[in-house]
Structures are given as C-alpha cells and as structure tokens.
Amino acid sequence: MRLPRFLSVILLGLEAALAESTQKWSIQDFKTLVTFGDSYTDDTRISYFINHNGSAPPVGWVEPITNESASGGYIWGHFVHQYAHLSHRYNYAVSGASCSNKITPRATSFGLYPSVLEYEVPAFTADNAYHIPSTGEKFLQNDPDSTIYSIWIGTNDLGNYAFLTDSQVANNTIPDYIDCVFNALDGVYKAAKGKYFVIMNMVPLQLAPLYATPENGGIGANNYWPDKSGNFTEISYRMWEQVSTVNQVYDYRTPFEWVVGKRYPGAKVAVMDMYSLISDIYYHPQQYLNGSAPANVTGYIHHCNVAGSECETLSSPDSFLWYDQLHPSQRTDEIIAEEFIKVVKGGSEYATYWS
C-alpha cells in the first residue's frame, strides 16, 4: 500500500532531521552570550523593575552583576562568562517571567512580571539597534559568528498560578507555551541574524521541594505557594507529566522547525537536556556536590516562613542541589555553566544538535 504523498514528505523530512542530529556543531570563537529566561537565569534585572515602580530599564542599560541571584549567589551565566573567558554577556532574563503574559500572566507588586515575548525580546531588539551617543559604537557586541543565544523558560509557565493550577488564560494549552518559545526565537533571529542558539529544556521540577512528593522532601504551604493544599503526590505527578510532555515536544518540534520547516535558515541549534543533567545530580550527588556536609538533594539551603518575612540560611551551600524550594543552588549553577560550555564546543552528552 502506497503512503499518501504528504506523509511521504513528512517521513523523508524527519529522516533527514534524524541524520542531522548526529552532526554536532561547535562555535570556534565563543565571545558573547545573550540569555533570555526567568529567575533561573536573571542576575539583577528584576530589581530594576522593583526599584522603579515597574518601569523597565532604558535602552542601553548595563546590568549590574551581583552574587544575590535566585541561586543564593551568582547565576550560571556569570560562570559561563568566567570559565569561557567571554568578552561580553548580555542577560535579558527577568525573575518571575513566563514566556508570554497572554498565556500565563503572573502578578507581582508592580503589575505583571515582564515576559520573554512581550518584554525581553523587544528589549534585546531595541538594544541591538542602539548606538552609544558619545562614541557611535554599537551597544551590543554580538557578532553572529561568535555569539550564542540561549533561552531557558518554562518553570513559571508550568508552575503554580499557571498551568499546574489551571490558572492560564482561557483557551490556552501547553502547546501554546511551546509556540511562544519559538516565536521568541523568531524575534531574536530576525533582529540579530543569529547563527547559534541553545534551547535549555525543563528541569525535573517534580523533584524540586516545591513540587516533590512528601517522601522526597516535598513541602506544604510556603512563601512561593502560600495556599498550597490538596494531594501533594498528585501535584508532583502532574508536574512530572507536564515537564515530560514539554521535553518530548522539544525533541520533535526543534528538528521539525530547523530541518523540515527551514524556519531559521543558516542558524544552528542545540537542545540542552537540563532534565537529564539535574537528574544526574539528584541521583548521583556525590559526583557533583562538594560541600563540607553530606550531599543533600531533597533539602535546600534557604528556608523562609510562609510570609517570607523570616528566613534562615543553612551552612555548607555546596552540599545542596537546591538553594530554596524551587531554585538550583550556586553549586548547581556552576555545574550547569561547565556543561553549557561543553554544549557550545560540541562535546556534551546532554545536547542534541540541529542545523
């Protein structure tokens, strides 16, 4: 029996995509990193919004770098900059961000958290077109041949007060969030003529204390989810299902867009498998965590009451996978940075490459 022509075309395209996946790419002269995302990536951009009544930083704003990120110290991008001896790093990630406020808007003290699609990509686009008045020099030093663009978004989209609790905007589904990620990449690709992209997939959020089962260190009501209630095991398994679904979609959607659909001509992409990397730390902590205390993957360093007004920070931070109930620790971010550089060089076991 002959296959319909359209099915034959799709199968041929997917076969070509699978062949392409074995062809790793590497950037020979990695000088600049441009990042988009949420608190897993933000340095201090959210602080500007908080300190300026919700107003965004002006075009050409230089983000200060401090060791007060959501990791409890420096964020992974800082360590990539340091370890790879980069010339430039530009970080557009904002703590609290989702991919789009038209899908999963999240409220904060000044309104809605800025999102990737509605704020971060336009901010980058404006900076990319900006020239410093005093010198006429281009603000962003992002030559396409030496710049990596990364996006790591979804923790808030899939979490409480979003898809996990059915709080998304009506008639939106998880595939809409995936569409948003590629729409964001469209904007970056168009503005910068980017050649190298890294999509970082979802970590195993069902193992984070905020969403874990009780026997795996899961917690009840807390400062990130004050009204958490119900069956915590059911919550954890639903999160697991969501994360697994998203990552499987990335696995087939990315080669489709790059190889079959030719959506990004001339560009290359790696999907960095954050799920497997964090799982390896979780299940083999002695190989990764090097604090003075025993390795701890179910607990966390920074504990606060439900109001968030009283907090305690434990000692030996390098012993922990998690800084708080949701965010990886600085030690984990160091590991992420080391692996990210391997991804860029084409030598990571945690990446699939497409071009």
Positions of the model-derived regions?
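Fungal secretory targeting signals
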Residues: 1-27
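Extracellular/periplasmic catalytic domains that process cell-envelope and extracellular macromolecules
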Residues: 26-29, 82-86, 139-145, 149-151, ...
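Structural recognition of the beta-strand scaffold that forms the well-ordered cores
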Residues: 32-36, 40-44, 88-93, 147-152, ...
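A solvent-exposed, charged loop/short amphipathic helix patch at secondary-structure junctions
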Residues: 48-65, 160-174, 213-237
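Conserved SGNH/GDSL esterase-like catalytic core that processes O-acyl groups on lipids
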Residues: 60-176
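A structural motif corresponding to the C-terminal end of an alpha-helix
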Residues: 79-87, 184-198, 234-235, 241-271
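Mobile gating loops/cap/lid regions near enzyme active sites that modulate substrate access
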Residues: 204-237, 262-327
